[in-house]
Amino acid sequence: MEISTKTLHFIEEHREDDTRTLALQSKKYPDVDMAAAVTQIAGRQVAARKIPSWYPVSALWYPPHLSMEQCSSEATALYKASLLEGDTFADLTGGFGIDCSFISRNFKQADYVERQSGLCELALHNFPLLGLGHIRIHNRDGVSYLQEMLPVDCLFLDPARRDGHGGKTVAISDCEPDVTVLEPLLVDKAKKVMLKIGRAHV
């Protein structure tokens, strides 16, 4: 993702402005990529309340608003991190990287696996800015990575809890990936496996 200097300045100057109003003013700022600016401003505004330790790092890049609203909060990520530690860690459903970023601090080496190239690009940019140079980025499907990876101390998965039409799933087996099928392999590849699932799946 490339953001011009003028757009970066605009983002900084308008970081607290209403993004809906800004989106309607693109003609006033022809040298600004307004779509990118609005995405980043909205992302920082969500981060201010959801990931407060990230907010002061102005150079971070953020995904579209829906991804920000759906990602883990700093508070829940810190709780997960408090339960895990060791030498090697892998997050097979990396997403925006909130969980990976906080959990990985308790490990010497970490692997972030995500099949969406756009999210991998954000992780590649953001992790070094957060002092997380020990995380390796893999733009791959988590299941195929799991099948080939070396064993680790801990695996983390956050299965998608919505179907292809956007509806919420009810059974764990309906989530993506289906961890009920992967269970033998997960146990074989890690000393500990942490899954993030919704209340409806318990």
What are the residue ranges of the model-derived segments?
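SAM-dependent transferase fold signal centered on methyltransferase-like domains
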Residues: 1-202
